[in-house]
Amino acid sequence: MRKLQFAMVALFAVLLMACASGYHDTRVVNTQTGVEKDPQGPYQSLVVGALVEHELRGHLENAIVARFAEQGIKATAAHTVFGDKGIEGKSRDYLAERMQENGFDSALAIHLEEQRSETLEVKGDPGAAVPIAGTMTMRPQVFSDDFFVNEDIYVVRLDLWDVAQQAIIWQGNTVSFNTGGFKGLEKGAGHFAQVITNAIGKADIF
């Protein structure tokens, strides 16, 4: 029993450290190929753009480009070519022309569709029941108090474009969970990149 108590305390300590340092996970909800038109590859030069105003935008784009490179796919982070210019109000003709001018035949657009925060209650370990001194009443030993963790949830839509056709040829949706705030997002960029590049890889478009 004592070994079990020590194991529970150790497990709780690990959980507490994970929450303090930031936990980040991304999952693919669904994917679809041939959304507007079918892929007409081969595609030789992809531009990756995170269409959200955030100081980690460049960090995320770079992480995705690095993952594509590991798969043998030539990709470029949009911020290194187009800076911080958004696409709000720009026509498909204009965007396609700009991308073709810079040698891109495909584009991955990352849209943040929803962001919300939830507070999660983590129950402390009650331990084993022990008798109250001088009585026959049993009560649990409490090794740790309950505590609360703030979790940020991000719902993302991914659009893969064929520039020449001006059409979405693949689309995916992901949900990410983050408890580490800014640091959690920074640490989670690599995992997010791995998840979405693997999903695109399974579509066998490149």
Language-model region placement:
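Sec-dependent bacterial lipoprotein signal peptides
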Residues: 1-19
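Surface-exposed short loop/turn segments
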Residues: 89-160
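C-terminal/domain-edge helix-coil "capping" segments
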Residues: 19-43, 138-206
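Hydrophobic alpha-helical membrane segments
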Residues: 40, 67, 131-133
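A generic local structural motif
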Residues: 2, 32-35, 93-95
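Second-shell loop/turn segments in exported
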Residues: 46-55, 80-86, 144-147, 178-185
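N-terminal segment of the mature soluble domain
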Residues: 49-120
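Alpha-helix termination/capping residues and helix-transition junctions
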Residues: 13, 40, 101-104
